[in-house]
């Protein structure tokens, strides 16, 4: 029996396309990566207000951006290795929780030190979540054609985060 005949005998309610849960998983991973990249650049818009409200010095204000980038870049490889050792999903969730909690603290910061410290923690969350998210895509999409599409979607949405 050929494949075309087998496909024509499937029940009408059975899904014939790609598994939607995988694409939903990709949407979650891409949305989080969008937020991680967005968080690097979105602060620049708020810097004058942050400087005024929290009475930052000029050099101190640079640490609002640099703290995040330093931790994210500095621990990116470690985050990837930890996700290999302890599981990508586990590290992704840990990174999201760390990032989210630090974001709340950033929003509630009442001093320059509190804001800078929480930006360092946000960068650490990014270093955990980012590599784990990228590592989950090949697991969700074992077929090379679908994987390339998924990586394109993930990368494109992540790049959009830097434009805001």
Model-derived segments and their meaning:
Residues 2-164:
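Transmembrane-helix bundle of Major Facilitator Superfamily
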